[in-house]
């Protein structure tokens, strides 16, 4: 279709001839008789006016036709129409069923949630409640910012604008249950924070899930209120995602931890409290006593000058009474030089494993000597202790028939 400028460019009046201009001048200077006949110039002007009128009528009709086309068929001649776009969207295979996982890109966030581009007809919405397995006030607390690409799950549809509703929380729940099943299979000890209590036991947060710890499965005699907001060691007893049932035991965790507390082993602990006679140290959910006499070879008159609640330190297991649940600890045995725990505790912790190894070797030698002394009176074992203290086969130091000890030779317990 020609443009309006092109249309109007053709509407030009023909220039008047020189004879016509002279005739006009003559008519002004020499008025003619009104009754005279019409001149040829006037006839030509009338004819020209009729031609212009015809062009104007054609132009008017052209505009009317264009208007009618715009009114009845506005998209005629356009290569890709709105209807074509809608048809293309319908042909796009996008699964919007609830439970479907989709990949999306966050492009806007606010205090209430986030808008996510999932390549659908419209943007999807992620509310702050569905953004994380933990309670948060803003999606950015869960690391959700514009530009983040993540996998979401469709949980519904907004009826007001047909936009899809997304969730990250549901995906995180599935991963949390899977992780708990894995930890149960591996029979490992986990630390969990106590967040509540009821008539039956404690409620602890494990991998973002609320787990139940029956009072019968708690090793500590402390009241439930004393354990609130504290971390305790736990082992999995039952993990049932279908029934949303997660049961744990503190007693089993403590028992397993105690089994690993060998004499001479070095463990990491946290100072819980100070008493005049020593410091109580938390070593993986078990409270051990670091007696004031076992802090350093040098005398410690005030424990607070060496330790403070919350301090992290390395301690060595000195003794462990499993029946009574008592553990004695020592940093004194870890000192490279007497008094280092007071002057340079950092050096003590750096050399802890090395000093503990020396301690264990001395213990092993002492136990070997004790067994050898017992074997001196048991020649039937075929072993004896030589004069230089080495345990070996029975030699000539003892007669082949052993040592004949009569009852009179054995001292009584009173004499001892």
UniProtKB/Swiss-Prot annotation:
<dbReference type="GO" id="GO:0009579">
    <property type="term" value="C:thylakoid"/>
</dbReference>
<dbReference type="InterPro" id="IPR003029">
    <property type="entry name" value="S1_domain"/>
</dbReference>
<comment type="similarity">
    <text>Belongs to the bacterial ribosomal protein bS1 family.</text>
</comment>
<dbReference type="GO" id="GO:0009570">
    <property type="term" value="C:chloroplast stroma"/>
</dbReference>
<dbReference type="InterPro" id="IPR050437">
    <property type="entry name" value="Ribos_protein_bS1-like"/>
</dbReference>
<feature type="domain" description="S1 motif 1">
    <location>
        <begin position="99"/>
        <end position="169"/>
    </location>
</feature>
<keyword id="KW-0687">Ribonucleoprotein</keyword>
<feature type="domain" description="S1 motif 3">
    <location>
        <begin position="264"/>
        <end position="332"/>
    </location>
</feature>
<keyword id="KW-0934">Plastid</keyword>
<keyword id="KW-0694">RNA-binding</keyword>
<feature type="region of interest" description="Disordered">
    <location>
        <begin position="1"/>
        <end position="34"/>
    </location>
</feature>
<feature type="compositionally biased region" description="Low complexity">
    <location>
        <begin position="9"/>
        <end position="21"/>
    </location>
</feature>
<feature type="domain" description="S1 motif 2">
    <location>
        <begin position="187"/>
        <end position="251"/>
    </location>
</feature>
<dbReference type="InterPro" id="IPR012340">
    <property type="entry name" value="NA-bd_OB-fold"/>
</dbReference>
<comment type="subunit">
    <text>Part of the 30S ribosomal subunit.</text>
</comment>
<dbReference type="Pfam" id="PF00575">
    <property type="entry name" value="S1"/>
</dbReference>
<dbReference type="GO" id="GO:0005840">
    <property type="term" value="C:ribosome"/>
</dbReference>
<dbReference type="GO" id="GO:0003729">
    <property type="term" value="F:mRNA binding"/>
</dbReference>
<feature type="modified residue" description="N-acetylalanine">
    <location>
        <position position="45"/>
    </location>
</feature>
<keyword id="KW-0809">Transit peptide</keyword>
<dbReference type="GO" id="GO:0009507">
    <property type="term" value="C:chloroplast"/>
</dbReference>
<keyword id="KW-0689">Ribosomal protein</keyword>
<dbReference type="GO" id="GO:1990904">
    <property type="term" value="C:ribonucleoprotein complex"/>
</dbReference>
<keyword id="KW-0007">Acetylation</keyword>
<protein>
    <recommendedName>
        <fullName>Small ribosomal subunit protein bS1c</fullName>
    </recommendedName>
</protein>
<keyword id="KW-0677">Repeat</keyword>
<feature type="transit peptide" description="Chloroplast">
    <location>
        <begin position="1"/>
        <end position="44"/>
    </location>
</feature>
<dbReference type="GO" id="GO:0009536">
    <property type="term" value="C:plastid"/>
</dbReference>
<keyword id="KW-0150">Chloroplast</keyword>
<comment type="function">
    <text>Required for optimal plastid performance in terms of photosynthesis and growth. Required for the translation of plastid mRNAs. Involved in cellular heat stress response and required for heat tolerance. Required for transcriptional activation of HSFA2 and its target genes in response to heat stress. Plays a critical role in biosynthesis of thylakoid membrane proteins encoded by chloroplast genes.</text>
</comment>
